[in-house]
Curated annotation (Swiss-Prot):
This is Chaperonin GroEL. One of its GO terms (cellular component) is cytoplasm. It comes from Bacillus sp. (strain PS3). Its main location: cytoplasm. GO terms for biological process: protein refolding. Its EC number is 5.6.1.7.
Length: 538
């Protein structure tokens, strides 16, 4: 296919038009008085959202050169979302400001490479300063503030704070759609995995359709068990203790399963069998986690352990196990706290090293199950459109809260960026590098300016006053008052602000140093001239 090429100023201007179109659509959502954007969907009702990255991903422009610029800024939002989970609109606003200011200077004859070095120098200082003024997050109230600011909803803030308090900072918090109108929290204590009972004959509570085992022993193996002879040594010892047994195995079938069911129906012995969770290496890791949590051992021939020589000392224990048709929950496992802590630290180390998103998700799940539990926020709303919008906001709030726990918080509403203004301005640089520093200085004013404009105020006046205010004092666009932002609960996670600034600078530097753009040439419509004559057809 033939290509079309644009060079230097013409190429950069075309990209800037695309940057502006995307950024202008995204930045109307910034701040407490930001508006929503309606996105057309090919199927179903339109999506109404104020989530920057969702809007950015939807935008596709007709002009291929403009589209390149738009896609580069969408990349800023996407990357910030991947790292921090929030702050995508801020990142877009920063990128637009840097690109716009940078191109003005390049058009006036500045060297793009010099500007790039200046931008990188300024951002490095800005990031260090943001970390220096960051405050660690303390207690449930601070967590609620971060979540409430991100979701623009006090109730959501309280819900997320309660979820994190219940399952701990390493716990898994997931979102589900509720059947009703209200948004509520459901917490699963202990370790839960997605495997239920095989036979309904194992149920102990017919009303709830679940098998509840009080103070059971837990046999953990990766084997397929078909002969009762293999299980007998362990079964006899458990029966003598008069306690129930949970068997977690690859499968229990034939004679072994029949014997367990018959004994349960006769009331002589209560044993519930569930399939081992996961597959392959992941199954081995999960069985090992269950063993550590319950103080048992994985009976595996790979490890030189055989079922027929299993003693009661190799079995795990828990205060309670609840088995439903689809899940098994182990509450208060009797594992050694030192072993559990060591396993948690090992998973954390693996999390730092992994580059796969899938592996990261699975490691996070394992960590949560060992560390405390799983919380489910069931999101409710009156209509499907509102439900989607609410779910996106809660997801952002959740990510924002995790980022705050990780790297602390700073003053919100763009105030943290304004508080580092003087430190960045003090950087010693000359020529085009100094121009790069000035571009970053102008860009870090932009979030405050945009928040004020979205609230119907003159942004420049707010920016000028902020430059002379004490650190931490900022403008509350929701009430129109000047307040201590952290005391007022208007906070932003440092990780979110830092990521937004770094990603915006990275893409801005790429656009400024672009000298040519290559795109596909649109095909001309050749019409139907070569169609054969259809004769007398109607």
């Amino acid at each position: 296919m033939a290509k079309q090429i644009k060079f230097s100023e013409e190429a950069r201007r075309a990209m800037l038009r695309g940057v502006d179109k995307l950024a202008d659509a995204v930045k109307v959502t910034l701040g407490p008085k930001g508006r929503n954007v309606v996105l057309e969907k090919k199927f179903g009702s339109p999506l109404i959202t104020n989530d920057g990255v969702t809007i950015a991903k939807e935008i596709e422009l007709e002009d291929p050169f403009e589209n390149m610029g738009a896609k580069l800024v969408a990349e800023v939002a996407s990357k910030t979302n991947d790292i921090a989970g929030d702050g995508t609109t801020t990142a877009t606003v920063l990128a637009q400001a840097m690109i716009r200011e940078g191109l003005k200077n390049v058009a006036a004859g500045a060297n793009p490479m010099g500007i790039r070095r200046g931008i990188e120098k300024a951002v490095a200082v800005a990031v260090e300063e943001l970390k220096a003024i960051s405050k660690p997050i303390k207690g449930k109230e601070s967590i609620a503030q971060v979540a409430a600011i991100s979701a623009a909803d006090e109730e959501v803030g309280q819900l997320i704070a309660e979820a994190m308090e219940r399952v701990g900072n390493d716990g898994v918090i997931t979102l589900e759609e509720s059947k009703g109108f209200t948004t509520e929290l459901d917490v699963v204590e202990g370790m839960q995995f997605d495997r239920g009972y095989v036979s309904p004959n194992m149920i102990t509570d017919t009303e709830k359709m679940e098998a509840v085992l009080e103070n059971p022993y837990i046999l953990i193996t990766d084997k397929k068990v078909s002969s009762i002879q293999e299980l007998l040594p362990a079964l006899e010892q458990v029966v003598q203790q008069g306690r129930p047994l949970l068997i977690i195995a690859e499968d229990v079938e034939g004679e072994a399963l029949a014997t367990l069911v018959v004994n349960k129906l006769r009331g002589t012995f209560n044993a519930v069998r569930v399939k081992a969770p996961g597959f392959g290496d992941r199954r081995k890791a999960m069985l090992e986690d269950i063993a550590i949590l319950t103080g048992g051992e994985v009976i595996s021939e790979e490890l030189g352990r055989e079922l027929k020589s299993t003693t009661i000392a190799s079995l795990g224990r828990a205060s309670k196990v609840v088995v439903t048709k689809e899940t098994t929950t182990i509450v208060e496992g009797a594992g050694d706290s030192k072993r559990i802590k060591a396993a948690i630290n090992q998973i954390r180390a693996q999390l730092k090293e992994t580059t796969s998103e899938f592996d990261r998700e699975k490691l996070q799940e394992r960590l949560a199950k060992l560390a405390g539990g799983v919380a489910v926020i069931k999101v409710g709303a009156a209509t499907e459109t509102e439900l989607k919008e609410r779910k996106l906001r809660i997801e952002d709030a959740l990510n924002s809260t995790r980022a705050a726990v990780e790297e602390g918080i700073g003053a919100g509403g763009g105030t943290a960026l304004m508080n580092i203004h003087n430190k960045v301005a003090a950087i010693e640089a000359e020529g085009d590098e100094a121009t790069g520093v000035k571009i970053v200085l102008r860009a870090i004013e932009e979030p405050v300016r945009q928040i004020a404009q979205n609230a119907g105020l003159e942004g420049s006046i707010i920016v000028e006053r902020l430059k002379n205010e004490k650190p931490g004092i900022g403008f509350n666009a929701a009430t129109g008052e000047w307040v201590d932002m952290i005391e007022a609960g208007i906070v932003d996670p440092t990780k979110v602000t830092r990521s937004a600034l770094q990603n915006a600078a990275s893409v801005a530097a790429m656009v400024l140093t672009t000298e040519a753009c290559v795109a596909d040439k649109p095909e001309e419509n050749k019409g139907n001239n070569n169609m054969p004559d259809m004769g007398g057809m109607m």
